[in-house]
Structure formats: C-alpha cells, structure tokens
Amino acid sequence: MANPTHSQVVAAPDSSGRLLRLVSASSVMMQLLGKSTNIRMSQILEHHEDEDFSAHRTKIVCTMGPSCWDVDKMVQLIDAGMNVCRLNFSHGDHEAHGRVVKNLQEALKQRPGKRVALLLDTKGPEIRTGMLEGDKPIELHAGDMLKIVTDYSFVGNKSCIACSYEKLPSSVKPGNTILIADGSLSVEVVECGKDYVMTRVMNPAIIGNKKNMNLPGVKVDLPVIGEKDKNDILNFGIPMGCNFIAASFVQSADDVRYIRSILGTKGRNIKIIPKIENVEGLLNFDEILQEADGIMIARGDLGMEIPPEKVFLAQKMMISKCNVAGKPVITATQMLESMTKNPRPTRAEAADVANAVLDGTDCVMLSGETANGSFPVQAVTVMSRVCFEAEGCIDYQQVFRATCQATMTPIDTQEAVARAAVETAQSINASLILALTETGRTARLIAKYRPMQPILALSASEETIKQLQVIRGVTTFLVPTFQGTDQLIRNALSAAKELQLVSEGDSIVAVHGIKEEVAGWSNLLKVLVVE
C-alpha cells in the first residue's frame, strides 16, 4: 500500500477499535515540508558565542520548582528567555505557590522592562495507585497476577494494590491495557469485579507509592475540574492574578465551557488553555479548539494513550489547526529531559525543539528541566538558542501564503487589516510591525500570519500585555493611555530604537483603530519612516 500523502487522512486504531483520525489536510507547515526552509551552509558552520539569542520569537514556558524558584534564579531565567511561569498544582499548596509568585514579582522589579505571564496548571482528573506496605517499592514479574482494588485506603503489596478511581471496574473490560508509573508497568485486564479489577503483569517492573495510571482508549468518568481544582482556581488563580488556566485532561468543548462558568465574572478575562492528553481530547479537538483560548499539547500522557510513533502526527495536526485558527499552542513534555541531570541536551532533544518551532508552535515548555533539574538556567538558554536558529531558516513568505490559503473566507475587517499589514511589511521590507491593541486581538491576528518582522504590541492593559507573552513573534510595550495615537507611535518608535528593533531610516507598518476610544477594532494601516 502506498504511503499516505499530507492531504490524506492518517488513521490509527485505538484500543476501543475506533479510528483516531489525524487529519492533516489543513496543515500549514506540513504543506510546506521541504519548501519552507532556506538553509545556507554558512548558517550551519558559523557559530557566534556573543549572538543575542534573546530575540527568539518562540516563547518559553518554565515550570517552577525547588531548582529555580528563588529570586536570583528567576532573574537568571528571565535573562535566559523565560516568558511564562508555570505553576504545577499537581504538586505544592497555595502557600508554596504564593511564595513563587511573590519571588517572581521581586525578580521582575530587577528587570522592569520585562513581562512574565502566570499559568496555573490544574491537577485534573488524575488516577493514581495507593500506598504500599512499609512505604517500600514492590517488584513484579511478567505473568504475575495483580489485583487492583478501588478502596483507596487499602495498603498494597505485590499481589494487590489500591487505585483512586472508583469506577475502574465499570470503565475497563477484559483485554484492556492499564499503564502504571509513566508506562513502566503494563498490565492486562482479565476480570472485572464489583470493586476490583484482576490483571496480568505484562513486563517486569518495580513501582513505588502513588504512581500515575493511564487507561489507553478508555473514557474516564471523572470531572475535568474536581473540588481541589475549583479551590485552586477560585482561591489562588483569580486573586493572585494568573493569566492562564491550563486545564488537564480536557475531553470536550463542554469541559471548556464548564471551566469558564467556574471562573465567573471575577475570572472572565483569564484565558483557558486545554491540555490535550488523551484519545477523547484528540477526537474532539476541533470543538475544543473553537471554545478554547489556546491549546497545550501534553505529549507525556498523550504518548500513553496513542502509539508513540503517532505522537508526532498528532503534534503536527494540532499545531497546524491552532495556527490557522490564530490561537496560541504550547508544545510540552520531555523537550530537554536529559538536562535535568546533564548540562547539554541530547542531539535528538535539540532537534525536537527545532522541529516544534518549524511545525509552527507558539511556545515550548520546560517541566522537570527547570522545576527539579540541576541546570535550569542552561536549559532555558539552550532552548532560546535552538528556537532562534530554527526561526532563522523559515521561509516566511511561503508560510504567509499557506496561511492565507488555509484561512476560510470571508474574514472580518480586523483580520483583513492584519493580513494586509504583514503583506505590506514584506513588500516594503519593513523592519517592524507596530500594533496598538487594547484586547490583544490585533497583535494575535498579525502574529497568525507569521511575518518575518518582529511585532511590537502597545497596550494600556497590563493584563493584555501578560496574555501576549504566549504569542509567537510579539514583543510588548505598556503605555499609559491610548489617547493621542500619533504621540504614542512616536514614543513606541523611540522605545523600539532603544530595543534595537529599528534604526533611523527604517520603514515600519503601524496598525490601529480610527476611533481611539473603541477597543477591539483596528481598521487603519500606516507606513512610517523612523526618524
């Protein structure tokens, strides 16, 4: 059978017999495979230690933890390229995360021109094994029978362990596979009782207390937001000024709407980023994307739900659809995993980061590398360098044309002006695109078309400035007011000169609204020369 083309549907059967349909017909980056890069030998052979890699366009999300959460280390992370601070609520309490936020605020006082967004990552409907006798790991061998009970108070041993998911016996059936401890242990279901599941161990493994469990191909009957998550969002996320909620294990658009209802009026401006990490999330991706403000590709758990050789297809499909929708996408998990212990990444890891950039991701994320690793600052530095290099070999005109082709028409006035701004900037070889934006939409629409020029977004809203930290190619500048547009633009150009984004005599393209008092409707495009 011939290999499928990029315009065909790539399908893989999951454990339920359904087809996991990964449609790549709308792909922007995949359509340009082999055409969107312009690589010269000099780029490969030249190496400049003093090059400013902080100009990378792809944003970097750093997970907080003991290795990086003191003030001095945060300052170093900001200098190395951190744009978003991720608070992982699978670990730690409100007091600990509150100290992180306070330390970040102190660090930013030392870097007054920088902005770092806050992302609250929920624990979500996680399933875990229970405690073990004597807190000692158990050793299992292939062929062993292992009983899993739903009484979570049960203290386990090598023949029986507890599980936190009460509906496990009714959710799985004989023949299903259960993955434990990040997949290091696979067991096959052989019998389902009222309050237990009997399984057969498929491979030798040693597991400890409270390890995570995955049920590939099984729809887990747990709320996307539990009581702990509600408490974290309402009593920490909103009052502490978090800009994003990364919601774990989202399976449908209804899940996103439910989270929005929890946020209510007090949290109405917080952006929701569903994490796609199971088959249901993939199958319902289009409806989730339509309802969401962005997407996180959580490759760790996703790689347990679908075959590992399919993860890259899912990644490319999701990034492509986010690009066409003009919504930010974060690529996450094990990007520089070896740097938790080593000062240099594996070559495969560096290539993984670069390929995510070439795919079109807005952000790349570090997890244990910064939270618990021995080289957190080096990890961010490496990521900045790789992003910078990958961005330098993209054919932005090809990407622009493909994005225009993939975007359904008609488009609204604001997007038409944004698209025209990018095309004009290309035509006149402008050095910068300037966007005056109250809500951030103008800057997001310009960034959707991936101009080769940097985008400088001016906003009077600190909240908007923070939320633009996940948008690829956007640099932000806080202004006191939008009254007096011409003076604002002059001030912005002076700031751009200080940031070395433009020089005297350069052409720039500016986008803003005719009516200064009306937010969310930019309909004016100007071409200016820097004086």
Curated annotation (Swiss-Prot):
Pathway: Carbohydrate degradation; glycolysis; pyruvate from D-glyceraldehyde 3-phosphate: step 5/5
Positions annotated to bind ATP: N88, F89, S90, H91, R128, K211
Residues annotated as binding K(+): N88, S90, D121, T122
Enzyme class: transferase
InterPro entries per UniProt: Pyr_Knase, Pyrv/PenolPyrv_kinase-like_dom, Pyrv_kinase-like_dom_sf, Pyrv_Knase-like_insert_dom_sf, Pyrv_Knase_AS, Pyrv_Knase_brl, Pyrv_Knase_C, Pyrv_Knase_C_sf
Similarity comment: Belongs to the pyruvate kinase family.
Identification of the protein by name: Pyruvate kinase
Phylogenetic classification of the source organism: Eukaryota, Sar, Alveolata, Apicomplexa, Conoidasida
The gene coding this protein: PYK
